[in-house]
């Protein structure tokens, strides 16, 4: 599928803007800024200063250390190339989002010095919505999970910390980092919708396996035991004495006040996690009626990822066993029918937020032209859990990140990719079956792509390097 600049995700189209300075969310932002200032004289502050890069080469030493492979343009050209392209798309997406919203950086708002004062003047009037370090860190880490799945938890943890470092440095608010990571998930949709980019990722993974002397990852359909473990890469739920928990409380009370409104009615309906309901709420945004009869391949794909997303939260739910808000406060929810069944089920992360977000990511890859509408509905599906009283806000936020990590991991699993291919063919009106072909047949008949991932309608006529199948082709 050919994608253009106008297709690049804009956070403002499906995510909330910066918080009002009169809101509890801003109070949480300010508290996190103050925490960050306190961290600057510690070892975490030293790491934060090192993390504050703006170019791709600034991030690579971290991943090189994690993987035990020196990632450079000369040593790992395939890995470098795919990361370089990804960074370019991230820059465009961040710029597009900032054209919609301006948020003044913390150090500039308070007329203070940041952790890296040499660049303060340069970035003082550049919006921090969304956080570039959070976007880059989470995006590069999700892609590296596809290249190096054996290190997935360590990679994701480090990717999360890049955003945290920008808070410590005084360059981003906490809310900016949340937007940045969610935007990164949408960017993964964008690159996967370009078939040529998938070939570049495959070449990068093969290069990693060669350089690290590792065997390729076993093909198959991912089980939840192999999914990234959120206990290892996400922070624990907020402590009761923290400002973040105060924000959780504020969101819970605000959500409770909406239960008699139209948004409350939607939240009550969203408590339905049946396949029929999920398909119905995404059909409008998707642009086609999704059902077992009308779109059997898409339906099957949604069914599979819904279950996997739920399972991706299981380890963290059992590990933290966070008490749900309605149980903790001896309160009622908007949908009493599920209260008894979920009373002993851990609240963190939110399974509903996770599978809603993962379904949104998957449907957007099938129809990227509807990305903003689909992902906005996925976001609101998760927010309904706060209004309903079944989850705290931090549970829902963690659910989206868990889904993003699972989305990346799924893209190296052959059964998922085969079902995704069937779903895309079904959406385009072609046969839902996939004809078996030999490797030579596939390579010779495969379309050509530019190194930027743009599919060509015919064989290239201009000189340059192209991708066909899993191979580079040079047109002289």
Question: Which residues make up each language-model segment?
Answer:
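C-terminal tail/sorting-segment detector
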Residues: 465-476
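Surface-exposed, short loops/turns at beta-strand junctions within beta-sandwich domains
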Residues: 460-462
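Residue-level detector of functionally pivotal "anchor" positions at catalytic/ligand-binding pockets or at interdomain
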Residues: 430-452
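Hydrophobic alpha-helical bundle signature of multipass membrane enzymes
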Residues: 3-172, 182, 190-200, 206-388, ...
């Amino acid at each position: 599928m050919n994608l253009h600049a106008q297709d690049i995700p804009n956070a403002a189209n499906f995510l909330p803007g910066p918080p009002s300075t009169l809101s509890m969310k801003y109070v949480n932002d300010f508290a996190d800024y103050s925490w960050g200032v306190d961290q600057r004289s510690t070892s975490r502050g030293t790491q934060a200063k090192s993390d504050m890069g703006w170019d791709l080469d600034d991030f690579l030493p971290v991943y090189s250390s994690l993987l035990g492979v020196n990632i450079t343009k000369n040593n790992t050209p395939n890995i470098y190339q795919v990361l370089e392209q990804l960074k370019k798309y991230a820059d465009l997406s961040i710029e597009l989002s900032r054209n919609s919203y301006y948020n003044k950086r913390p150090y500039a708002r308070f007329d203070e010095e940041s952790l890296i004062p040499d660049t303060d003047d340069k970035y003082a009037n550049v919006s921090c919505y969304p956080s570039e370090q959070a976007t880059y860190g989470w995006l590069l880490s999700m892609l590296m999970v596809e290249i190096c799945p054996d290190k997935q938890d360590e990679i994701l943890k480090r990717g999360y910390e890049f955003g945290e470092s920008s808070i410590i440095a005084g360059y981003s608010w906490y809310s900016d980092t949340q937007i940045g990571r969610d935007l990164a998930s949408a960017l993964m949709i964008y690159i996967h919708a370009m078939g040529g980019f998938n070939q570049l990722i495959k070449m990068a993974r093969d290069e990693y396996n060669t350089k690290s002397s590792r065997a390729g990852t076993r093909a198959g359909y991912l089980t939840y035991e192999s999914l990234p473990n959120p206990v290892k890469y996400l922070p624990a739920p907020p402590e009761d004495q923290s400002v973040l928990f105060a924000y959780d409380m504020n969101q819970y009370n605000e959500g409770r006040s909406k239960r008699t409104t139209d948004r409350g009615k939607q939240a009550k309906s969203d408590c339905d996690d049946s396949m029929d309901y999920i398909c119905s709420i995404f059909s409008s945004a998707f642009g086609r009626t999704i059902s077992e009869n009308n779109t059997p391949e898409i339906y099957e794909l949604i069914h599979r990822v819904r279950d996997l997303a739920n399972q991706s939260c299981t380890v963290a739910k059992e590990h933290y066993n966070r008490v749900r808000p309605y149980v903790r406060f001896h309160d009622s929810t908007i949908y009493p029918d599920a209260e008894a069944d979920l009373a002993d089920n851990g609240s963190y992360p939110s399974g509903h937020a996770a599978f809603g977000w993962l379904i949104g990511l998957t449907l957007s890859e099938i129809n990227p032209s509807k990305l903003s509408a689909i992902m906005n509905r996925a976001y609101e599906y998760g927010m309904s859990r706060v209004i309903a009283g079944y989850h705290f806000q931090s549970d829902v936020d963690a659910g989206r990140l868990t889904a993003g990590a699972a989305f990346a991991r799924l893209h190296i699993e052959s059964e998922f990719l085969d079902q995704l291919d069937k779903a895309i063919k079904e959406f385009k009106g072609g046969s839902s079956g996939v004809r078996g072909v030999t490797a030579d047949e596939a390579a010779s008949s495969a379309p050509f792509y530019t190194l930027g991932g743009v599919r060509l309608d015919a064989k290239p006529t201009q000189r340059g390097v192209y991708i066909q199948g899993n191979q580079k082709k040079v047109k002289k």
